[in-house]
């Protein structure tokens, strides 16, 4: 259904596949790639980045969850900045930073988006900030101007 809807990428939570899912992560990655889609792996706030290292050569982006998945409007978890920096530095040191983007999802606000970008965030998911603002277009333009 995602492909039919026009998706150009699919991401999934590594935690959902590492222990109890029927398909191991590598099989899902291959399924996504065979359909000519970009593949991303998502990390919950408490999951260490190290769990993804063995998959880096196969993916296009990492989704760093900056809130616990489940519902919108949660507050940004400040320790996410350190995790983004850790991932960014690792990718730079491995000389693969130009191949893997860092997406940050959850609690992105006008007060913290610059810190997220400075730490290495490439794609910011700012749902509540945008859709609950008086002027969503102005909010997006302000964030994009940075």
Please give the residue ranges for each predicted region.
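Catalytic cores of alpha/beta
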Residues: 1-4, 47-59, 106-124
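Glycine/small-residue-rich loop that forms an oxyanion/phosphate-binding "nest" at active or ligand-binding sites
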Residues: 1-41
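Surface-exposed amphipathic alpha-helices with a cationic face
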Residues: 3, 26-36, 83-95, 141-144
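Hydrophobic faces of well-ordered beta-strands that scaffold small-molecule active sites
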Residues: 10-12, 39-43, 62-64, 100-106, ...
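Glycine-rich phosphate-binding active-site loops on the catalytic face of alpha/beta enzymes
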Residues: 10-19, 63-75, 119-139
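Active-site beta-loop-alpha junctions enriched in small/polar residues
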Residues: 15-17, 42-46, 67-68, 105-111, ...
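Glycine/Thr-rich beta-alpha phosphate-binding loop at enzyme active sites
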Residues: 45, 53-85, 89-102, 139
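Alpha/beta catalytic cores of nucleotide-metabolism and tRNA/nucleoside-modifying enzymes
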Residues: 89-90, 97-104, 109-146
